[in-house]
Amino acid sequence: MTDLDRRWDLPSAPEDLLYQAAILSRFFPALAVHLRSSLGGLYLAAGSLAPDEARDFNARMDQDKSVLDLNYYRLLRLTGNLSLAADMDLPQDLPEEDRDIVEETELVCRETESLAKLLGLTLRFRCQEGRHLCALRRDAVRQLLLQLLSNAFKFTPAGGEITVALSSGNGWVHLTVTDNGPGIPPERKEHLFDRYLRADRNHIPPHGLGLGLPICRRIAEGHGGRIMAESQEGRGTRITVMLPDRQTGKLALADQPMDYGGDFNPTLLGLADVLPAEAFQKL
């Protein structure tokens, strides 16, 4: 095993931890800045070459532009995760306001239901409460849910089913995402939410760098909550996010603009790594 190979393995020694911490804290965020700057120029140029009004009458142009948009969104999503990698281990309380978590969760499910169908999947939302106010950061919880759905879509084969469920009790709100995919190997479960580079380095595409679930952990902990996984190989996976069932007294009067992806569609952005180009077509 070469030194480079060893560095991509799960950390087993102090020098491995320091090495990966340096990459995640310094190199990745700097790389994200340069990528985002270049991507912006590329996207504007592509929009000039294939404007929306022309795509309405040119199926080939529409298909070609959808492939470009898909890959652009994937890179933009990656740069967002790389930017967040620097401070995932730093304690941070997210600013919150009282919102209806049932409404917010159901909205994300409605937005992603048709995208799930493109992958041959069925997405269901289950909640016995019609309304439930609790303190949360709306854009962060949306990002968390989209990341969990992205993982479920990615690993569940066509014909599978994903269920998003909400419940409350004993001072907690439980948000679960359950799939009937292949499950998680036991050796990976221990490190599922760790902020480290993926061990299966030879299989990075299409599974990414493994930063998504650590970001979910950061969001849950930023709300004073926690996240956990249950999985059996061959029988699927359930991810549970527990958020404190409390209120701040600050009601959300209007939706605030979401800054995760600028002016881009946040739902497509959050699921870009699993979607087909068809999701970006106009025709």
Briefly describe each language-model feature range.
Residues L70-L75:
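Short alpha-helical segment of the dimerization/phosphotransfer core of two-component systems
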Residues E97, K117, T122-H132:
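Conserved catalytic submotifs in the C-terminal HATPase_c
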Residues G212, C216:
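Short alpha-helical Gxxx[C/S/T] motif in the catalytic ATP-binding
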Residues I184-Y196:
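Short conserved segment of the HATPase_c
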Residues D179:
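Acidic ATP/Mg2+-coordinating residue in the GHKL
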Residues G224-G225:
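Conserved glycine-rich
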